A protein has these predicted regions:
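A structural-propensity feature for long, helix-poor, extended segments
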Residues: 179-186
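Terminal targeting signals and extreme-terminal segments of soluble enzymes
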Residues: 1-179, 192-226
Length: 226
């Protein structure tokens, strides 16, 4: 079976923000999820979210993101993924993570994931490591989105933006996740202290029940002083 690919844009050095702004979500995934009731809060006209291509699913023609772009991009693993970002994160030049009412505004990044049986552990049950990878990837998309906008507002555009890496990911599994099936992954920024980024995430079933929760620490590289 051939691996599906998102539409490519003509750039040898495509960036994360290029993908968010210029690569539309795959029509097949939009059509698939639009038929499911769980997607309506994110796809309706009044939604605070914008559908995006998950950057790690985009084929960059190099060795980056091979796990999500190739290995887990098959009919038996993750046949469909549709990502969403809070519109404010893309559009605001004065972002703040302080005093945000998460009950009111919701998560920063949402992933709708169609799980195939290729990621199973027990029979008809998604492997915990697969769920951990989805949590980590959603958290990564969250921090990268924030970091790009904050970097643009805090420093000269010519300054190099440091990379950030997972330093700690603590997951609590509450219930098995049936597979094949549909899950919803939420991720949000809690706070930032210098190079440290504190985030939260959770996995919901199609019925809205929480299946897993995570807290994470990401750390940005030190910026070299010239």
């Amino acid at each position: 079976m051939s691996t599906r690919k998102t539409k490519e844009i003509e750039s040898a050095n495509v960036t994360f923000i290029d993908i968010l702004n210029n690569v539309p979500p795959e029509n097949a995934s939009l059509t698939f999820f639009a038929a499911l009731p769980c997607s309506r809060p994110y796809l309706n006209d009044s939604s605070p979210y914008q559908p995006i291509t998950l950057p790690s699913r985009y084929n960059k023609n190099d060795s980056s993101d091979m796990f999500f772009c190739k290995t887990m991009n098959t009919p038996s693993t993750f046949p469909h993924i549709l990502a969403f970002i809070r519109k404010e994160i893309l559009r605001s030049n004065h972002l703040t993570w302080e005093n945000l009412d998460r009950e009111q505004i919701g998560p920063d990044i949402v992933l709708l994931v169609h799980l195939g049986s290729g990621g199973n552990g027990f029979r008809d049950t998604a492997h915990g490591g697969v769920l951990a990878a989805l949590l980590d990837e959603t958290l990564g998309c969250c921090i990268e989105s924030w970091a790009i906008q904050l970097h643009a507002s805090e420093q000269a555009s010519s300054a190099t933006r440091p990379r950030s890496y997972t330093a700690n990911l603590n997951i609590s599994y509450h219930a098995p996740v049936e597979s094949p099936g549909i899950i919803i992954v939420h991720a949000w920024l809690k706070k930032r202290e210098g190079r440290k980024w504190f985030l939260g995430a959770k996995i919901l079933g199609e019925d809205g029940r929480t299946r897993a929760e995570a807290s994470a620490l990401w750390i940005s590289e030190r910026v070299a002083v010239m």
